[in-house]
Curated annotation (Swiss-Prot):
Family named by the database record: Belongs to the ATPase alpha/beta chains family.
Keywords: ATP synthesis, ATP-binding, Cell inner membrane, Cell membrane, CF(1), Hydrogen ion transport, Ion transport, Membrane, Nucleotide-binding, Translocase, Transport
Name of the molecule in the record: ATP synthase subunit alpha
Residues forming coiled coils: none
Domain of life, per lineage: Bacteria
Location in the cell: Cell inner membrane
SUPFAM superfamilies reported in the protein's UniProt record: C-terminal domain of alpha and beta subunits of F1 ATP synthase, N-terminal domain of alpha and beta subunits of F1 ATP synthase, P-loop containing nucleoside triphosphate hydrolases
Statement: the UniProt record of this protein carries the keyword Phosphoprotein: no
Enzyme class: translocase
Purpose: Produces ATP from ADP in the presence of a proton gradient across the membrane. The alpha chain is a regulatory subunit.
Length: 510
């Protein structure tokens, strides 16, 4: 072997020239400690807040949340048992993002946008978007003026929800909160079957900390009723790590924003944000952030406000798209003055209160119409609904007041008795079975019959039968009236024909 002196001296010179340079360890760090889904890592000097990192030895990813002077606190998206002290951690150089686009419709994904429904990879992804972005400012927005039809009479008549609104659904466990949300998704089948893209309403259902069986049941219901085709389900079940439960609403929101920013309409349901707050509290306490009220961190209000502010109605210059948010909050023993409920009530544009007592009295959906409110109000209703439902709120309020007095006195005058009878029938009329949302023209006819006195002579127990037979009669004999209400969105031109149809039906009903 021939060794040339010149080569050796060149190698030695280069070694000497490079001697003493610092090795750059900014993109690779090592684990100092790990436990409870949190890793403390040394050496990731240039990592950004919210950046993805990878643990190559364990094959899991994480997100940098705490950037401290001598270490970085990382939350782990997965099982931390395979991670050991001293393991290598690599920066991925990207903030957490998810795939967005119409290719996700009909799919069930995890909070990182990976499919978990066994139907193979997601096709035709439009782009990838960061999960946590700034909400639109004041200038790109427009006031809410188009309705989101939930298909539930109690909501569409009294607490109307508009496209771009944030309407909270709040109540104890087992009061039908998810049922209201699922019915809203099912009711969009008719508009999504049409060809008018400006009327379609795509749906995103985000399940946070739910049982897997519950999520599977909801997906099955949507699939059986043909609603999964226009719905994305984002699932972070109770068995998933807290960081994924915390991330799920943001991932779903990024998917919804793609529709909003491309001139389409979407509604997103967060079921429920109480569990997201609990997951965030767990992460924050493990990261040693200082606790505040009810041990939640100080920025839990900001967590929910920055999420819900992303629901918006955009103006003409920005494509007229909208994202409507229906967050769900679970209360304990009807206590709406707890920390998270009061926070979310103050962020949203109204709330739908569901009550256990009403639920067990058989009033379902169990909406307490007295304290539920929509701050957008009748600007989110079509003209026909305003005309039909105008008197109903006042009549129900008077009914509740008189019903409270009627408990004490037996000798009631005729006007009071009439008011009580009308209120009972209207309350009965607002009942509705699950998975049977009504089209807006059917609701207009039902509510018009109730508020204009056509139910006053019907026994309360017969109101449900009267309504179903009335709608069958209208479809059979007066489909033209229903079509006109649906297309013209106004009662004026058909009101006289509707009155005579109702009078004829009321006379024949027995």
């Amino acid at each position: 072997m021939d060794i040339r002196a010149a080569e050796i001296s060149a190698i030695l010179k280069s070694q000497i020239a490079n001697f003493g340079e610092e090795a750059d360890v900014s993109d690779v760090g090592s684990v100092l400690s790990v436990g409870d889904g949190i890793a403390r890592v040394y050496g990731l000097d240039n990592v950004q807040a919210g950046e993805m990192v990878e643990f190559p030895s364990a094959g899991v990813k994480g997100m940098a949340l705490n950037l401290e002077r001598d270490n970085v606190g990382i939350v782990i998206f997965g099982e931390d048992r395979a991670i050991r002290e001293g393991d290598e951690v690599r920066r991925l150089g990207e903030i957490v993002d998810v795939p967005v686009g119409k290719g996700l419709l009909g799919r069930v994904v995890n909070p990182l946008g990976e499919p978990i429904d066994g139907k193979g990879p997601i096709q035709n992804v439009a782009e990838r978007r960061r999960v946590d972005v700034k909400a639109p400012g004041i200038i790109p927005r427009k006031s809410v003026h188009e309705p989101v039809q939930t298909g539930l009479k109690a909501i569409d008549t009294l607490i109307p929800v508009g496209r771009g609104q944030r309407e909270l659904i709040i109540g104890d466990r087992q009061t039908g909160k998810t049922a209201v949300a699922v019915d809203t998704i099912l009711n969009q089948k008719q508009v999504n079957a049409g060809g008018d893209e400006s009327q379609k309403l795509y749906c995103i259902y985000v399940a946070i900390g739910q049982k897997r069986s519950t999520v599977a049941q909801i997906v099955k219901t949507l699939e059986e009723r043909g609603a999964l085709d226009y719905t994305i389900v984002v699932s972070a079940t109770a068995s998933e790590p807290a960081p994924l439960q915390f991330l799920a609403p943001f991932a779903g929101c990024a998917m919804g924003e793609w529709f909003r920013d491309n001139g389409m309409h979407a509604v997103i349901i967060y079921d429920d944000l109480s569990k997201q707050a609990v997951a965030y509290r767990q992460m924050s306490l493990l990261l040693r952030r200082p606790p505040g009220r009810e041990a939640y961190p100080g920025d839990v209000f900001y967590l929910h406000s920055r999420l819900l502010e992303r629901a918006a109605k955009l103006n003409e210059d920005n494509g007229l798209g909208s994202l409507t948010a229906l967050p769900i909050i679970e209360t304990q023993a009807n206590d709406v003055s707890a920390y998270i409920p009061t926070n979310v009530i103050s962020i949203t544009d109204g709330q739908i209160f569901l009550e256990t007592d009403l639920f067990f009295q058989g009033i379902r959906p169990a909406v307490n119409v007295g304290i539920s409110v929509s701050r957008v109000g009748s600007s989110a209703q079509i003209k026909a609904m305003k005309t039909a439902a105008g008197p109903i709120k006042g009549e129900l309020a008077q009914y509740r007041e008189m019903a409270a007095f009627a408990k004490f006195g037996s000798d009631l005058d005729v006007a009071t008795q009439r008011q009580l009878a009308r209120g009972e029938r209207l309350t009965e009329l607002l009942k509705q079975p699950q998975y049977s949302p009504l089209a807006v023209e059917e609701q207009v006819v039902s509510v018009y019959a109730g508020t204009r006195g056509y139910l006053d002579k019907i026994p309360t127990a017969q109101v449900g039968r009267f309504e179903s037979e009335l709608l069958s009669y209208m479809h059979a004999k007066h489909q033209d009236i229903l079509d006109e209400i649906r297309t013209k969105k106004d009662l004026g031109p058909v009101e006289d024909r509707l009155k005579s149809a109702l009078a004829a039906f009321a006379d024949s009903f027995a």
